[in-house]
Amino acid sequence: MAVVLDLLNKDTRPKLDAPARPRHPEKAHRPDTAIQRKPDWIRVKAPGSKLWAETKDIVRANNLVTVCEEAGCPNIGECWEKRHATFMIMGDTCTRACSFCNVRTGLPAALDEAEPEKVAEAVAKLGLHHVVVTSVDRDDLKDGGAEHFSRTIVAIRRASPGTTVEILTPDFLRKPGALEVVVAAKPDVFNHNMETVPGKYVTVRPGARYFHSVRLLQRVKELDPTIFTKSGIMVGLGEERNEVVQLMDDLRSAEVDFLTIGQYLQPTRKHHEVVRFVPPDEFKAYETTAYAKGFLLVSATPLTRSSHHAGEDFARLKAARLAKLGPAPVAASIRAVNA
């Protein structure tokens, strides 16, 4: 199938200093959708401080990719000023084509075998106490990149023994044994985002399967109950409140500990439209409902993103588990897993 480039559209046309291939070739045929003006409650500070520049320099010096940049995260200024960055491993090109995502799609390059050590070096240079590592989908790899995740976790622990590690993984769809490899590396937090309610998967996340993702999170707890599990969704894609509440029930049935809910923001005219900007009071209502259903921690605001305030949230997660279970049951579960 031929891909026709719209050279008049500044959002999709190739940059003069970039390869001719468009960033999202599978979206080139889609009609333009107007990008709505953001409401007053969605405002962020433009990046540009000295600490932001230092973080950027460390990322560049190690030839690393961050989801902060690739996904166009609105919180990049705040996070990088704190020397926090979410590392995206296994390249900058994803094998999926989700309609909400700004990450480049196509056929990825071979894995950089030195990348785990490069990430570990950057974590040490930044002095991170808590690091988040995510990846593109790599359906082209036999294990979906599970071994690469494992090697990255091990490298970080070796270089920075006091640093806690949070991972945000793809779904490892049709990759038997992949999840077990990642869990065996013992990340402190295992995050896999549901992204949206099941009724929107066909248009928003067509390469994934809703109940496979639920089962993935459930399986993590079965393999190692001491690992915190986490998942997130976007709202504003046309979902109904009752669908979000049902998703909460599905995640609690999988014993997920932490739920994040944020406003979907449309990256370009070729991406899924924003159906509605959800006001802050509705986010607060979602938070109240989620806590009532038993989540240990909930973050629900328009600018909530999976990795936003991840270090602070990890401390809150540990405190919430301790308050709920007490020190004896927590210690017993750790001993059981390590036995």
UniProtKB/Swiss-Prot annotation:
Superkingdom, natural source: Bacteria
Database matches in SMART domains: Elp3
**Which GO cellular component terms, listed alphabetically, does the Swiss-Prot or TrEMBL entry include?**
cytoplasm
Q: Which SUPFAM superfamilies match?
A: Radical SAM enzymes
- Extract the GO molecular function terms from the UniProt entry: 4 iron, 4 sulfur cluster binding; lipoate synthase activity; metal ion binding
Pathway of this protein? Protein modification; protein lipoylation via endogenous pathway; protein N(6)-(lipoyl)lysine from octanoyl-[acyl-carrier-protein]: step 2/2
- Where are the disulfide bridges? none
The UniProt annotation puts the region (Disordered) at: 13-35
Where located? Answer: Cytoplasm
Instruction: Cite the entry's keywords alphabetically.
Output: 4Fe-4S, Cytoplasm, Iron, Iron-sulfur, Metal-binding, S-adenosyl-L-methionine, Transferase
Q: Does this UniProt record's set of keywords contain Transferase?
A: yes
The residues listed in the UniProt record as binding [4Fe-4S] cluster 2, with positions renumbered to this chain, are 94, 98, 101
Q: What class of enzyme is it?
A: transferase
What does this protein need as cofactor?
[4Fe-4S] cluster
What range(s) does the Radical SAM core domain occupy? 80-296
Q: Which reaction does it catalyse?
A: [[Fe-S] cluster scaffold protein carrying a second [4Fe-4S](2+) cluster] + N(6)-octanoyl-L-lysyl-[protein] + 2 oxidized [2Fe-2S]-[ferredoxin] + 2 S-adenosyl-L-methionine + 4 H(+) = [[Fe-S] cluster scaffold protein] + N(6)-[(R)-dihydrolipoyl]-L-lysyl-[protein] + 4 Fe(3+) + 2 hydrogen sulfide + 2 5'-deoxyadenosine + 2 L-methionine + 2 reduced [2Fe-2S]-[ferredoxin]
Annotated cofactor note: Binds 2 [4Fe-4S] clusters per subunit. One cluster is coordinated with 3 cysteines and an exchangeable S-adenosyl-L-methionine.
EC numbers, comma separated: 2.8.1.8
Q: Which residues does [4Fe-4S] cluster 1 bind? A: 68, 73, 79, 307
> What family is this protein classified in?
Belongs to the radical SAM superfamily. Lipoyl synthase family.
Q: What name has this protein been given in UniProt? A: Lipoyl synthase
**Source organism:** Methylorubrum extorquens (strain PA1)
Which gene is this protein's source?
A: lipA
